[in-house]
């Protein structure tokens, strides 16, 4: 991409994935504009970087545009998409734009059903600590830099490879890290076999000089290993992983473990994050860093001071000895993993969860799994389903989910109709020493922030 005079327009520019690419293009000198139905801190940042931001989608906003970028969240009936077609403006998916940017540098792509953002952040932090100043495109706000994109001067680009719609097959990374494979995104994939087939294609796209970094703890990755033709290494908590963690323990919100590479003990790591899932993510990042010849002492220092990503076990605050934590988890596996990490990090607290289901299609497809995901919570509130542009599905709602959770043995489940009623009950229920975990990929984090204001 060398046409710096291009005017690139993003439909839905405030999205976490779209905004990262937009910010990177701005830093490269392109003219960038875009629209979103809701202005936010993200769109404000883009405006401060030089982007023209429109509130709402209107056809007249794309009249002098060279390229229109969309995502799967944007309908074909969007007025800007229709206008672009009528004007013969080239329209491309977000993934294609990211793929073009990744061609500029030595590309490291991180994919998987869970842990992509955290792992990408860890790799970026380690490479930055090593003085390599990577370009970063990540699906979350990095606490260390306050944004989801960074245009580095170094030779590397580290980016999330989103598998949700198969678009990660557009990338051609030199290093491909896969954190796990899980049953997800069934609005696009037929079944788990279809998902595994796509991951095999992604992994085998790694060139002969590259490397695939694969989690041996995941049963679906275990299943596809015989089909992998790319050079690969494995990581995990398993004794059979090429890069493994030993002697895992937690103290407070920090994890401690020893890294073993084959038969060689590389050394001890103190991870400034809680949860075994984050140790697994750290192992993936360590494997990538070792492939790039980063010294272990640098890796150790980076992980000890890593700040993490917003909305990933993010401590929002504490009032009256009540702690409020927020997490993006919205899949049953993520729910269980996050609750386990909370129990490890805060073992003595009563855990009160406020869960906002995300998408009707996901709730329907994974309904049985959701009913058995919350046993580690002491008290559970379930909010209405966050539609995320979907239409309701008959027979799928939060009340049915609550009933299912209760039928599967959870004794303390409350179905609430909105934020206001949830906050009212919380105010009367919470006690000093409690931990409130807001959980979901929608806007449930706002409830946690409001709760802190009420408790002040």
From Swiss-Prot:
<dbReference type="GO" id="GO:0008763">
    <property type="term" value="F:UDP-N-acetylmuramate-L-alanine ligase activity"/>
</dbReference>
<comment type="function">
    <text>Cell wall formation.</text>
</comment>
<dbReference type="Pfam" id="PF02875">
    <property type="entry name" value="Mur_ligase_C"/>
</dbReference>
<dbReference type="GO" id="GO:0051301">
    <property type="term" value="P:cell division"/>
</dbReference>
<feature type="binding site">
    <location>
        <begin position="112"/>
        <end position="118"/>
    </location>
    <ligand>
        <name>ATP</name>
    </ligand>
</feature>
<dbReference type="InterPro" id="IPR036565">
    <property type="entry name" value="Mur-like_cat_sf"/>
</dbReference>
<dbReference type="InterPro" id="IPR005758">
    <property type="entry name" value="UDP-N-AcMur_Ala_ligase_MurC"/>
</dbReference>
<keyword id="KW-0132">Cell division</keyword>
<dbReference type="GO" id="GO:0071555">
    <property type="term" value="P:cell wall organization"/>
</dbReference>
<comment type="pathway">
    <text>Cell wall biogenesis; peptidoglycan biosynthesis.</text>
</comment>
<dbReference type="InterPro" id="IPR036615">
    <property type="entry name" value="Mur_ligase_C_dom_sf"/>
</dbReference>
<dbReference type="Pfam" id="PF01225">
    <property type="entry name" value="Mur_ligase"/>
</dbReference>
<dbReference type="GO" id="GO:0009252">
    <property type="term" value="P:peptidoglycan biosynthetic process"/>
</dbReference>
<comment type="similarity">
    <text>Belongs to the MurCDEF family.</text>
</comment>
<keyword id="KW-0067">ATP-binding</keyword>
<dbReference type="GO" id="GO:0008360">
    <property type="term" value="P:regulation of cell shape"/>
</dbReference>
<keyword id="KW-0436">Ligase</keyword>
<dbReference type="InterPro" id="IPR004101">
    <property type="entry name" value="Mur_ligase_C"/>
</dbReference>
<keyword id="KW-0547">Nucleotide-binding</keyword>
<dbReference type="InterPro" id="IPR013221">
    <property type="entry name" value="Mur_ligase_cen"/>
</dbReference>
<dbReference type="GO" id="GO:0005737">
    <property type="term" value="C:cytoplasm"/>
</dbReference>
<dbReference type="Pfam" id="PF08245">
    <property type="entry name" value="Mur_ligase_M"/>
</dbReference>
<protein>
    <recommendedName>
        <fullName>UDP-N-acetylmuramate--L-alanine ligase</fullName>
        <ecNumber>6.3.2.8</ecNumber>
    </recommendedName>
</protein>
<keyword id="KW-0131">Cell cycle</keyword>
<keyword id="KW-0963">Cytoplasm</keyword>
<dbReference type="GO" id="GO:0005524">
    <property type="term" value="F:ATP binding"/>
</dbReference>
<keyword id="KW-0133">Cell shape</keyword>
<dbReference type="InterPro" id="IPR050061">
    <property type="entry name" value="MurCDEF_pg_biosynth"/>
</dbReference>
<dbReference type="InterPro" id="IPR000713">
    <property type="entry name" value="Mur_ligase_N"/>
</dbReference>
<keyword id="KW-0573">Peptidoglycan synthesis</keyword>
<keyword id="KW-0961">Cell wall biogenesis/degradation</keyword>
């Amino acid at each position: 991409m060398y046409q710096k005079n291009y005017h690139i327009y993003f439909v839905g520019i405030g999205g976490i994935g779209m905004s990262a690419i937009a910010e990177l293009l701005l830093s490269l000198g392109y003219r960038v504009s875009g629209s979103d139905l809701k202005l936010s801190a993200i769109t404000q940042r883009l405006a401060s970087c030089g982007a023209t931001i429109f509130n709402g989608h209107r056809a007249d906003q794309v009249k002098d545009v060279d390229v229109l970028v969309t995502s799967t969240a944007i309908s074909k009936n969007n007025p800007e998409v229709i206008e672009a077609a009528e004007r013969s403006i080239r329209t491309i998916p977000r993934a294609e734009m990211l793929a073009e940017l990744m061609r500029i540098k030595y590309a490291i792509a991180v994919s998987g059903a869970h842990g992509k953002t955290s792992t990408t952040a860890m790799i970026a932090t380690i490479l930055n600590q090593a003085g390599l100043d990577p370009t970063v495109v990540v699906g979350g706000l990095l606490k260390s830099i306050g944004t989801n994109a960074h245009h580095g001067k170094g030779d590397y680009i580290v980016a999330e490879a989103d598998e949700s719609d198969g678009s990660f097959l557009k990338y051609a990374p030199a290093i491909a890290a896969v954190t796990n494979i899980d049953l997800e995104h069934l609005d696009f994939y037929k079944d788990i076999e279809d998902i595994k087939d796509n991951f095999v294609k992604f992994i085998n796209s790694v060139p002969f000089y590259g490397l695939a970094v694969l989690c041996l703890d995941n049963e679906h990755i275990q299943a596809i290993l015989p089909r992998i033709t790319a050079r690969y290494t494995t990581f995990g908590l398993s004794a059979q992983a090429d890069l493994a963690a030993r002697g895992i323990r937690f103290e407070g919100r920090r994890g401690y473990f020893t890294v073993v590479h084959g038969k060689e003990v590389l050394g001890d790591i103190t991870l400034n994050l809680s949860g075994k899932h984050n140790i697994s993510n750290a192992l993936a990042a360590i494997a990538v860093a070792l492939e790039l010849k980063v010294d272990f002492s640098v890796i150790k220092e980076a992980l000890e001071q890593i700040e993490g990503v917003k909305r990933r076990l993010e401590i929002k605050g504490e009032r009256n000895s009540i702690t409020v934590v927020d997490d993006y988890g919205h899949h049953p596996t993520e729910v269980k993993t996050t609750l386990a990490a909370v129990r490890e990090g805060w073992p003595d607290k009563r855990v009160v969860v406020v869960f906002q289901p995300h998408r009707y299609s996901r709730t329907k497809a994974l309904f049985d799994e959701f009913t058995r995901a919350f046993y580690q919570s002491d008290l559970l509130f379930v909010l209405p389903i966050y539609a995320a542009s979907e239409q309701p599905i008959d027979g799928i709602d939060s009340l049915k989910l609550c009933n299912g959770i209760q039928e599967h043995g959870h004794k303390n489940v409350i179905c609430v109709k909105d934020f206001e009623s949830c906050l009212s009950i919380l105010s009367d229920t919470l006690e000093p020493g409690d931990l409130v975990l807001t959980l979901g990929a929608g806007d449930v984090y706002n409830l946690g922030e409001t709760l802190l204001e009420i408790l002040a």
